[in-house]
UniProtKB/Swiss-Prot annotation:
It is a multi-pass membrane protein. GO terms for biological process: L-aspartate transmembrane transport. Signal peptide: none annotated. SUPFAM superfamilies: Proton glutamate symport protein. This is C4-dicarboxylate transport protein. Belongs to the dicarboxylate/amino acid:cation symporter (DAACS) (TC 2.A.23) family.
Amino acid sequence: MKTSIFKSLYFQVLAAITIGILLGHFYPQLGEQMKPLGDGFVKLIKMIIAPVIFCTVVTGIAGMESMKSVGRTGAVALLYFEIVSTIALIIGLVVVNIVQPGAGMNIDPSTLDASAVAVYTQQASQQGLIPFLMDVIPASVVGAFASGNILQVLLFAVMFGFALHRLGAKGKVIFDVIDSFSKVIFGVINMIMKLAPLGAFGAMAFTIGKYGVGTLVQLGQLIACFYITCVLFIFLVLGSIAKATGFSIFKFIRYIREELLIVLGTSSSESVLPRMLEKMEKVGCKKSVVGLVIPTGYSFNLDGTSIYLTMAAVFIAQATNSHMDIWHQITLLVVLLLSSKGAAGVTGSGFIVLAATLSAVGHLPVAGLALILGIDRFMSEARALTNLIGNGVATIVVAKYCRELDEKKLDAELSGTNKSDNAATPTAQS
């Protein structure tokens, strides 16, 4: 029994994170030098994301009996994303107004170092609905795969899947080749995931070594407020949605515990995207639903990022004594409903969207970003974890609503009684 525990990815990643924290705290300079380990692991994952999405979406769509179901799945997913992310934005807004973590700080924006956030404000200037939509269309298919742009690859994969489906029997050879290639790709993923503990160790050692635990204490009220809000959102909002759909949020979290630990170590929900595609299909969701919902959710269903954006914006207003009446806050909410859709599931994207939002709202000092620059990295974990759980729940909800969910398989997997699949899960172990 002990041997199996030590061999599990869950234990290995947890141990790696703990060792990384200790190294970063007691030997900060050495901890900072571990950064390449975390970066290298994330780059390996990003290397494989584009082909995984392409294969999953193409085989999922091409293998469907009716094309109408694809359009229905997409429409249901987008509607769900909009409703739940709006709830997340409102919850963040309500909590930050009640707790007021920035009240009493009385900071003069002119004394803040705006140069520290210049790189984010520059990137934020490129944010906007039209540029975002235009960016979804790749200049070339090769460019989409080379850059690893999730939405560009998704767009091409959907079009390719539709075209392959229309070929019917003539396209069977191509379908079989892509399906076989998909199995090879997931074999590569299993190899990469063996390095997950090393990546989590390096990323955590760097974070603690560079920013220090002291940074957490300085603005601890905002961090604590944000983490508690994320927990409440997961168990109250997502938990209620899960219960209404027919499964337990607690069992689902246990089911993806290894992925959650990897995200905790790397601060990027994108680092487990390939594994989530595999696990959501294993839990009973049709491949076509998984292939559409998960990749799209990485831009349109970022619940943790939505909570962070409203809380951070109002915190800056409170700390700098920038008055925000109810109309200002409604304006902020409307702007975030659009700008939050441009955030990807990668570290730092939420900060860029926040910079864009402050610029768009106008009366909030963009220089106020310097206040949370030091602690943004520590809030990134909660954002990524909430985003991951949110996308997983969304996939099951959409699959059930579209009648593309095997509920018996869902119950068996979440209860741990599906022996055949559990036996196959050593891909995530040893």
